[in-house]
């Protein structure tokens, strides 16, 4: 892998490569830290299947002030990004900073829920067919679409799929339409936040679309990424409507739980069953 990657890095940067080493990657591609002969460093992510990620990074750079790695070059086979000096833990101050920049991101709006193209999450197709109603978009393009991906892959039992379909028909009992569609990172958890000191230096691996900010906030609680310091600061900027913690958070967690079930199977099914049982009885 490395020799062709070196040639691509030298071609697209116009600089000589001195050394490479592997970094822990995501669900798509191999990731290399490339040291250049002039002392610079870039990160190379090797595909195929990388075009959507490059497109999303460019979209966020154009439409938001979210901290991002600068994209030097992007196509379906390679993404080249400036190396972001990071690696610190998410402190309370860094959580508060994450809340500030995500609240700013969520202030960017569009005429519909969805996007004018499909994107990916963890390498899986993420359907973004625009819809004027959030409840319909979440039901069809998030909950049912990802449940079907998991079922087709043999990771979601038919009985669970049937219960999710029943729940999908009743979402209006609990979910609310937001004031407007909000631009979402879509995959904001600890592994996709590069922290330096008391700030998030960059958000990586986006899965963007316009949706309800609450789905982003719910996912942020799934692995304990966002805690009291985050939510205190976020609500100073954009207060949450009553009922998020009591009801809506669990319903929105079904989407990332289904993504993880499709990718990894196993233990995530129990979380899905717990939530479905709670709302269907």
Task: Report residues per predicted region.
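ATP-binding pocket architecture of kinase catalytic cores
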Residues: 21-136
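Active-site Asp-x-Gly
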Residues: 134-139, 148, 180-183, 190-247, ...
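Conserved N-terminal boundary motif of the eukaryotic protein kinase catalytic domain
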Residues: 13-21
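An alpha-helical support segment within catalytic cores of ATP-dependent transferases
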Residues: 2-10, 110-183, 236, 278
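Hydrophobic packing residues in well-ordered alpha-helices of helical domains and bundles
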Residues: 95-98, 160, 164, 272
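Hydrophobic alpha-helical segments that form the core
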Residues: 250-258
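ATP/Mg2+ or Mg2+-diphosphate-binding catalytic cores
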Residues: 259-281
